[in-house]
């Protein structure tokens, strides 16, 4: 991706630029969400959701092994994909980070791209759905909407360690 512009591109033949509309904040960066339907060929060909300020200003994480309801789509996705992690313990499906977010952004298995104001793109796949009935959850996420993106991680590598998402990805 060309992160030096106000637009992002996947460099695939016939692909169009997707202009980032700058709404909402994530720490120091403004965030736009570009949704892709699974197995689409062109980047950003799904719908765009603009996250309003002050939502989305923190990242959280959860252990992938905590998804234990065998009949759920979350569990089926975890088993089907083999529960793979990168060297830092982030859950990965292919080249995408496994994330949890509210149904505002899609359903289990959907590919979701979060475009930050600096042009960086967090390429995610929805591996868990945040519970809208949880105290403090709204349509954007937990903690009153401040936690829009929750990364799914290797619980044994992350819990009780003081690790943070931005420790491994300060560019976010």
Task: Give the residues covered by each predicted segment.
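Extracytoplasmic soluble-region selector
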Residues: 1-38
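Solvent-exposed, well-ordered loop and adjacent helix/strand elements within mature globular domains
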Residues: 39-172
């Amino acid at each position: 991706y060309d992160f030096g512009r106000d637009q992002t591109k996947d460099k695939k033949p016939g692909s169009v630029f997707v202009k980032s509309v700058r709404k909402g904040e994530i720490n120091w960066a403004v965030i736009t969400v570009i949704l892709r339907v699974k197995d689409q060929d062109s980047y950003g060909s799904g719908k765009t959701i603009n996250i309003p300020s002050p939502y989305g200003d923190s990242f959280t994480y959860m252990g992938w092994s905590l998804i234990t309801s065998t009949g759920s789509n979350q569990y089926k996705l975890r088993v089907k994909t083999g529960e793979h992690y990168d060297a830092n313990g982030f859950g990965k499906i292919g080249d995408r980070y496994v994330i949890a977010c509210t149904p505002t952004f899609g359903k289990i298995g959907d590919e979701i791209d979060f475009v930050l104001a600096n042009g960086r793109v967090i390429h995610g796949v929805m591996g868990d759905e945040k519970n809208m009935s949880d105290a403090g959850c709204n349509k954007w996420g937990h903690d009153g909407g401040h936690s829009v993106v929750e990364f799914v991680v290797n619980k044994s590598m992350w819990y009780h360690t003081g690790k943070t998402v931005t420790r491994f990805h300060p560019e976010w």
